[in-house]
Amino acid sequence: MPNARDGLASLLLIAIAAATAAPGHAAPKGAQAERPAEVATRGQREAKDISYGGWQKLCFKAGGAPTLCRTSITGQFATGQTAVRVDLIEREDAAAARLQLFVPVGMYLQQSPRLSVDQGAPFRLPYTWCLTNLCIAADVAAPKIIREMESGKTLTLELVDSNLLAMTTTIPLAQFATVRKGTPARTLEQDIDE
C-alpha cells in the first residue's frame, strides 16, 4: 500500500520534470539582444588607462583538421596586465564565427558585457566562464555584427564591475577588416603522426 512519502516523491518528480521541460528556458543562439538590466548601475566611468595594440591574425592548423583563425586585439593597463582582449574566431569549414572577450575578474557576472559599433544597436555577450585571473564572455557572432565591425571605426565595450559601476572603453576598428581578410601574422602547425 502506498504511503504519504511515496506520494510526495512522485509529486516531486513530476514537478522537476515539468520545470525542466518548460518552454522558454533555452539559451538564445548568437549575440544577445539588449534587455533591461535586472539591477541598475550606480554610476559610470570611462577606463582611460587602457592602451591597445594593433589587430593581429593568428591561425592554427593541427594535422588534417580545418584551419582555425583568431583575429584579436589586446588592451593593457600601464602595468602590463591584460585589461581586455577581443577575439573573432573562425574555422575554415564553418559558416559561423565566435566573438569572444577576455576581461579581468571582479565584474558583475549577472550583467553581460555590452558592445556597440559606432553607437549602433547594442548587443551582449554572455559570460561563459571565469578563471583565477580573467573572465570570458563569448557567443556566436551574427554576420551583421562582423560586417559592422569591418566598416566601423570603434567598438564600445561596457562592463559592470562588482560595485555596480558601468565602465566603458573604446576599441579601435580601423585595421580590423584588413587584418581579418589578410594573411595571418603567424600560422602554427602541428603534424600528427599516426
Language-model segments: residues:
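C-terminal segment of classical bacterial N-terminal signal peptides
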Residues: 17-25
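A generic "folded-domain core" signal
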Residues: 2-4, 25-194
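Bacterial N-terminal signal peptides that target proteins for export
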Residues: 1-12
